[in-house]
Amino acid sequence: MPFDFSFVRADMSGRDCLPIELSEVGVAKGGRTLIDDLNLSIGSGRRTVLMGPNGAGKSLTLRLLQGAIAPDTGVVTAGGRPLDASNRKRIGLVLQRPILLRRSVRANLDHALRAQRVAASARRDRIEELLTLAGLEHRADAPARGLSGGEQQRLSIVRALAAEPDVLLLDEPTASLDPHATQSIERLIDQTTDAGVKVVLVTHDCGQARRLADEVLFLHQGRLAEHTPAATFFENPVSEPARAYLAGRLVL
Protein backbone atom coordinates (compact mmCIF):
# COMPACT_ATOMS: atom_id res chain seq x y z
CA MET A 1 0.00 0.00 0.00
CA PRO A 2 1.44 3.45 -0.89
CA PHE A 3 2.79 5.31 2.10
CA ASP A 4 1.11 8.54 3.19
CA PHE A 5 3.82 11.20 3.24
CA SER A 6 1.45 13.92 4.43
CA PHE A 7 2.99 13.88 7.90
CA VAL A 8 6.37 14.99 6.57
CA ARG A 9 5.15 17.15 3.70
CA ALA A 10 2.19 18.98 5.16
CA ASP A 11 3.96 22.34 4.95
CA MET A 12 5.37 21.75 1.46
CA SER A 13 2.24 21.63 -0.70
CA GLY A 14 2.95 25.03 -2.25
CA ARG A 15 6.67 24.52 -2.67
CA ASP A 16 8.04 24.14 -6.18
CA CYS A 17 10.61 21.55 -7.17
CA LEU A 18 14.05 22.67 -6.01
CA PRO A 19 16.30 23.14 -9.07
CA ILE A 20 19.99 22.51 -8.44
CA GLU A 21 22.67 23.69 -10.84
CA LEU A 22 26.41 23.20 -11.16
CA SER A 23 28.06 25.95 -13.20
CA GLU A 24 31.64 25.55 -14.44
CA VAL A 25 32.43 23.40 -11.41
CA GLY A 26 35.87 21.93 -10.93
CA VAL A 27 37.35 19.67 -8.26
CA ALA A 28 40.96 18.54 -8.05
CA LYS A 29 42.87 16.41 -5.56
CA GLY A 30 46.57 15.69 -5.40
CA GLY A 31 47.15 17.43 -8.69
CA ARG A 32 44.53 15.29 -10.43
CA THR A 33 41.39 16.79 -11.95
CA LEU A 34 38.32 14.86 -10.77
CA ILE A 35 35.57 17.20 -11.99
CA ASP A 36 36.39 19.34 -15.01
CA ASP A 37 34.30 22.43 -15.87
CA LEU A 38 31.07 20.56 -15.09
CA ASN A 39 27.78 22.19 -16.03
CA LEU A 40 24.52 20.43 -15.26
CA SER A 41 21.02 21.13 -14.03
CA ILE A 42 18.74 18.96 -11.91
CA GLY A 43 15.28 20.17 -12.85
CA SER A 44 11.67 19.12 -12.66
CA GLY A 45 11.85 15.45 -13.76
CA ARG A 46 10.80 13.06 -11.03
CA ARG A 47 13.76 10.69 -11.36
CA THR A 48 17.18 11.56 -12.70
CA VAL A 49 19.82 8.86 -13.09
CA LEU A 50 23.55 9.59 -13.16
CA MET A 51 25.50 7.04 -15.17
CA GLY A 52 29.05 6.66 -16.41
CA PRO A 53 32.14 4.48 -16.05
CA ASN A 54 34.14 4.12 -12.85
CA GLY A 55 35.99 7.32 -12.04
CA ALA A 56 33.64 9.51 -14.08
CA GLY A 57 32.76 11.60 -11.01
CA LYS A 58 29.22 10.39 -10.30
CA SER A 59 29.47 10.02 -6.51
CA LEU A 60 31.49 13.21 -6.27
CA THR A 61 28.79 15.02 -8.23
CA LEU A 62 26.16 13.87 -5.73
CA ARG A 63 28.21 15.32 -2.89
CA LEU A 64 28.55 18.59 -4.77
CA LEU A 65 24.78 18.69 -5.34
CA GLN A 66 24.14 18.24 -1.62
CA GLY A 67 26.88 20.58 -0.44
CA ALA A 68 28.78 17.84 1.37
CA ILE A 69 31.87 19.16 -0.40
CA ALA A 70 32.57 22.54 -1.98
CA PRO A 71 33.98 22.92 -5.49
CA ASP A 72 37.45 24.34 -6.05
CA THR A 73 36.07 26.41 -8.92
CA GLY A 74 32.60 27.28 -10.13
CA VAL A 75 29.29 27.65 -8.33
CA VAL A 76 26.58 25.32 -7.00
CA THR A 77 23.11 26.86 -6.65
CA ALA A 78 19.81 25.53 -5.31
CA GLY A 79 16.60 27.37 -6.00
CA GLY A 80 18.59 30.08 -7.76
CA ARG A 81 20.73 30.84 -4.69
CA PRO A 82 24.21 29.68 -3.71
CA LEU A 83 24.02 26.44 -1.78
CA ASP A 84 24.01 27.17 1.96
CA ALA A 85 22.56 25.82 5.21
CA SER A 86 19.04 27.08 4.43
CA ASN A 87 18.65 25.25 1.12
CA ARG A 88 20.95 22.31 1.88
CA LYS A 89 18.40 21.02 4.38
CA ARG A 90 15.99 20.54 1.46
CA ILE A 91 18.41 18.04 -0.12
CA GLY A 92 18.87 14.56 1.38
CA LEU A 93 21.84 12.29 0.68
CA VAL A 94 22.02 8.52 1.20
CA LEU A 95 25.45 6.95 0.77
CA GLN A 96 26.18 3.57 -0.80
CA ARG A 97 27.38 2.27 2.56
CA PRO A 98 24.87 3.36 5.21
CA ILE A 99 26.21 5.14 8.28
CA LEU A 100 23.96 4.12 11.15
CA LEU A 101 24.09 4.75 14.88
CA ARG A 102 25.08 1.85 17.13
CA ARG A 103 21.54 1.80 18.44
CA SER A 104 18.19 0.31 17.52
CA VAL A 105 16.31 0.94 14.30
CA ARG A 106 13.75 2.97 16.24
CA ALA A 107 16.47 5.04 17.92
CA ASN A 108 18.03 5.89 14.56
CA LEU A 109 14.72 7.28 13.35
CA ASP A 110 14.11 9.08 16.63
CA HIS A 111 17.53 10.74 16.33
CA ALA A 112 16.69 11.97 12.81
CA LEU A 113 13.36 13.43 13.96
CA ARG A 114 14.95 15.08 17.00
CA ALA A 115 17.36 16.79 14.62
CA GLN A 116 14.29 18.28 12.90
CA ARG A 117 12.98 19.46 16.29
CA VAL A 118 9.88 17.28 16.04
CA ALA A 119 7.99 17.16 19.34
CA ALA A 120 8.10 13.92 21.32
CA SER A 121 4.34 13.43 21.01
CA ALA A 122 4.58 13.56 17.21
CA ARG A 123 7.78 11.54 16.95
CA ARG A 124 6.14 8.33 18.11
CA ASP A 125 3.57 8.32 15.30
CA ARG A 126 6.08 9.40 12.69
CA ILE A 127 8.51 6.67 13.67
CA GLU A 128 5.78 4.06 13.23
CA GLU A 129 4.93 5.45 9.80
CA LEU A 130 8.59 5.44 8.74
CA LEU A 131 8.99 1.88 10.01
CA THR A 132 5.97 0.85 7.94
CA LEU A 133 7.35 2.57 4.85
CA ALA A 134 10.66 0.75 5.24
CA GLY A 135 8.96 -2.57 6.02
CA LEU A 136 10.87 -2.74 9.31
CA GLU A 137 8.06 -2.80 11.86
CA HIS A 138 9.22 -6.22 13.05
CA ARG A 139 12.82 -5.02 13.41
CA ALA A 140 12.10 -1.76 15.24
CA ASP A 141 14.04 -2.71 18.36
CA ALA A 142 16.82 -4.63 16.62
CA PRO A 143 20.34 -3.15 16.39
CA ALA A 144 20.46 -1.11 13.19
CA ARG A 145 23.91 -2.40 12.30
CA GLY A 146 22.66 -5.97 12.60
CA LEU A 147 20.18 -5.58 9.75
CA SER A 148 20.76 -7.08 6.33
CA GLY A 149 22.24 -4.86 3.64
CA GLY A 150 18.87 -4.20 2.04
CA GLU A 151 17.24 -3.44 5.38
CA GLN A 152 20.02 -1.02 6.29
CA GLN A 153 19.59 0.78 2.99
CA ARG A 154 15.81 1.06 3.45
CA LEU A 155 16.38 2.43 6.95
CA SER A 156 18.85 4.98 5.59
CA ILE A 157 16.37 6.14 2.96
CA VAL A 158 13.44 6.64 5.33
CA ARG A 159 15.76 8.28 7.87
CA ALA A 160 16.65 10.81 5.16
CA LEU A 161 12.95 11.30 4.36
CA ALA A 162 12.33 12.26 7.99
CA ALA A 163 14.09 15.55 7.18
CA GLU A 164 11.36 16.45 4.65
CA PRO A 165 13.64 16.88 1.61
CA ASP A 166 12.51 18.16 -1.76
CA VAL A 167 15.32 16.21 -3.42
CA LEU A 168 16.77 12.86 -2.35
CA LEU A 169 20.20 11.84 -3.67
CA LEU A 170 20.96 8.11 -3.69
CA ASP A 171 24.47 6.79 -4.35
CA GLU A 172 24.17 3.26 -5.79
CA PRO A 173 21.59 2.17 -3.20
CA THR A 174 21.33 -1.38 -4.57
CA ALA A 175 25.01 -2.13 -5.15
CA SER A 176 25.84 -5.65 -3.88
CA LEU A 177 22.19 -6.38 -3.02
CA ASP A 178 20.35 -9.49 -4.18
CA PRO A 179 17.39 -9.17 -6.60
CA HIS A 180 14.76 -9.33 -3.84
CA ALA A 181 16.42 -6.56 -1.83
CA THR A 182 16.89 -4.52 -5.01
CA GLN A 183 13.17 -4.77 -5.78
CA SER A 184 12.29 -3.55 -2.29
CA ILE A 185 14.55 -0.50 -2.72
CA GLU A 186 13.05 0.27 -6.13
CA ARG A 187 9.52 0.08 -4.69
CA LEU A 188 10.58 2.51 -1.99
CA ILE A 189 11.97 4.86 -4.65
CA ASP A 190 8.64 4.62 -6.51
CA GLN A 191 6.73 5.55 -3.36
CA THR A 192 9.11 8.41 -2.66
CA THR A 193 8.70 10.00 -6.08
CA ASP A 194 4.95 9.37 -6.06
CA ALA A 195 4.86 11.50 -2.90
CA GLY A 196 6.51 14.40 -4.72
CA VAL A 197 10.13 14.00 -3.65
CA LYS A 198 12.55 14.19 -6.57
CA VAL A 199 15.13 11.38 -6.66
CA VAL A 200 18.61 11.60 -8.18
CA LEU A 201 20.15 8.15 -8.40
CA VAL A 202 23.64 6.89 -9.26
CA THR A 203 23.66 3.40 -10.76
CA HIS A 204 25.77 1.18 -13.01
CA ASP A 205 22.76 -1.08 -13.64
CA CYS A 206 21.32 -0.30 -17.08
CA GLY A 207 18.22 -2.37 -16.34
CA GLN A 208 17.57 -0.38 -13.19
CA ALA A 209 18.11 2.88 -15.04
CA ARG A 210 15.60 1.81 -17.70
CA ARG A 211 13.05 0.97 -15.01
CA LEU A 212 13.47 4.11 -12.94
CA ALA A 213 14.84 7.01 -14.97
CA ASP A 214 12.89 9.87 -16.50
CA GLU A 215 16.16 11.40 -17.66
CA VAL A 216 19.81 10.32 -17.75
CA LEU A 217 22.91 12.40 -17.12
CA PHE A 218 25.96 10.59 -18.47
CA LEU A 219 29.32 11.62 -17.05
CA HIS A 220 32.70 10.89 -18.60
CA GLN A 221 36.07 12.01 -17.26
CA GLY A 222 34.47 14.50 -14.89
CA ARG A 223 32.37 16.18 -17.57
CA LEU A 224 28.75 15.94 -18.64
CA ALA A 225 28.75 14.03 -21.94
CA GLU A 226 24.99 13.69 -22.33
CA HIS A 227 21.72 14.83 -20.71
CA THR A 228 18.71 13.30 -22.42
CA PRO A 229 15.35 11.64 -21.69
CA ALA A 230 15.86 8.03 -20.64
CA ALA A 231 14.17 6.60 -23.74
CA THR A 232 16.46 8.62 -26.00
CA PHE A 233 19.55 7.65 -24.04
CA PHE A 234 18.96 3.92 -24.34
CA GLU A 235 17.60 3.91 -27.89
CA ASN A 236 19.78 6.54 -29.56
CA PRO A 237 22.53 7.98 -27.33
CA VAL A 238 24.04 11.17 -28.70
CA SER A 239 27.60 11.05 -27.39
CA GLU A 240 30.29 8.58 -28.40
CA PRO A 241 31.24 7.82 -24.74
CA ALA A 242 27.59 6.91 -24.00
CA ARG A 243 27.35 4.70 -27.08
CA ALA A 244 30.58 2.94 -26.12
CA TYR A 245 29.40 2.51 -22.52
CA LEU A 246 26.10 0.93 -23.52
CA ALA A 247 27.91 -1.36 -25.95
CA GLY A 248 30.24 -2.49 -23.17
CA ARG A 249 33.32 -0.97 -24.77
CA LEU A 250 33.97 1.93 -22.39
CA VAL A 251 35.69 0.88 -19.17
CA LEU A 252 37.57 4.00 -18.05
Please state what every model-predicted region is.
Residues 66:
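Helix-to-loop junction immediately C-terminal to a conserved catalytic motif
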Residues 168-171:
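Catalytic Walker B motif of ABC-type/P-loop ATPase nucleotide-binding domains
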Residues 164:
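Conserved catalytic motifs of ABC-family nucleotide-binding domains
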Residues 143-147, 151:
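Conserved ABC ATPase signature
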